[in-house]
Amino acid sequence: METIHWQWTLILVSSLILFFLSPLAKTRDQFFKAVSNRKAPNTLVLTGSLIISWIFAKSITNAANLGLDYGIVGGVAYAGYYLSFAVAGILIYQMRTKGRFKSIHEFLTTKFGKGAMAIFSILIAIRLFNEVWSNTMVIGSYFGESGSQPYYLAIIVFTVLTLAYAVKGGLSSSIFTDVIQMVLFSVLLMIILGTIFSTEDFSTTDIVTSGTWSFELGLNLFFAAIIQSFSYPFHDPVLTDRAFITSPKVTRRSFLLASILGAICIILFSVIGVYAQTQGMKGQAAVEVGKAFGVIILLVINFIMITSAASTLDSTFSSFSKLLAVDLKMGKDLTFGRISMAIIAILGTLPVFLDVEILSATTISGTMVIGLTPVFVFWNMKVPRISFYLSVICGLVFGVVLVFGVFPESLMFTEGKYADLLWVNVWGILSCIIIYIIPKFIVIKR
């Protein structure tokens, strides 16, 4: 059997297995809150769900490519984004225990009004929209060249099959399959790393000496990731939805564990790129390493991409349906929730037919929402409602500045790739905090 046939078999068989294993949601609590027999997910289940739902196909592709470009420094830099879990876990714990808020939307509506909640909802809807195409494009790339018939066919089939089991159980299906996918991911990653370390010309010494710890060669991205971690998690409903389905203590514990374990997973996956670097490979690190080791490892890498992309997709579908049905109260029954899943699946697939860079779904959207930093970091600070709008608009402006590459070089104090990303975020987040707090003192003076 040819490799391409094995790849199709992996997609079809794994999706069908998940469909038949997924629980059928019959109540709103099961579909939108993953409550089964009045029991919420425990620490182990929630931690696994958090990690795998954030180990996107695009994120592990980026991790491997950064390992290829910058050595282990690139992997560590990208793992910086996983500080997001710790930040969200601690702040949402405080919001739930001290503020008694039951959702992010309730917090925003109570403190800043319905207008702020509407703007926030638009931001996270765009985020969910991005998640669909940016992950399915990675899957398509394993089946054919971008724009080819096999490429499009793989994307459409994969999206439909994932939608099928997501529609069946909603968030219950998502979290249930997350556990299976996390176990699969761990086993497959160990197989890949075991194969790499079994070669005679690669060792841990090669990993340690593979990069240079300088701003120009990876640290720009690392510090940008750390800065964005104080706003990034709050515009990701896949993450925040899971912060309100268990007790505050279980949630905090799970998020802190996910922060550490998720970062380790990303760094380990970047080792694939480090190996590619030592062998002088070019192009997509994961694909090239798979080809170098033969059909079996290529299929293992392909399967790990399918696993991570499916996890992200089903989480995206369930979060979008919850956004419309629960947070925005646009529909009450499960039928509405299932229809909304189909809508985001269709809309999110349309950009596949356009030429869009995968990485842009992470870095640019991350910059555009830095205005959320003071909103959540200073969640208990009394400020007028205008503070929310000023900070969010300020963040969007800096995001646009980054997109068009018009940020003054005189305000960048490091060089190399991602220098603009770092310094736009540094100056942007300082501006957002200042502009968020200023109205507080103006109102007091009056």
Regions found by a protein language model. Give the residues of each.
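Selective recognition of specific alpha-helical transmembrane segments in multi-pass small-molecule
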Residues: 12, 122-133, 184-194, 221-233, ...
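Loop-to-transmembrane helix boundary motifs in multi-pass membrane proteins
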Residues: 114-118, 322-360, 365-366
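A generic transmembrane alpha-helix motif of multi-pass inner-membrane proteins
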Residues: 1-23, 388-446
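Helix-loop-helix module between adjacent transmembrane segments
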Residues: 76-166, 228, 305-315, 331-334
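Hydrophobic, small-residue-rich membrane helices and short re-entrant helix-turn-helix hairpins
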Residues: 101-109, 169-178, 234-264, 281-287, ...
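Membrane-interface helix-loop-helix modules in multi-pass membrane proteins
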Residues: 35-100, 227, 239, 244-280, ...
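Membrane-interface "cap" regions at the ends of multi-pass membrane proteins
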Residues: 1-60, 166-172, 182, 188, ...
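Hydrophobic alpha-helical segments and their helix-loop junctions in multi-pass secondary transporters
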Residues: 17-27, 128-132, 136, 140, ...
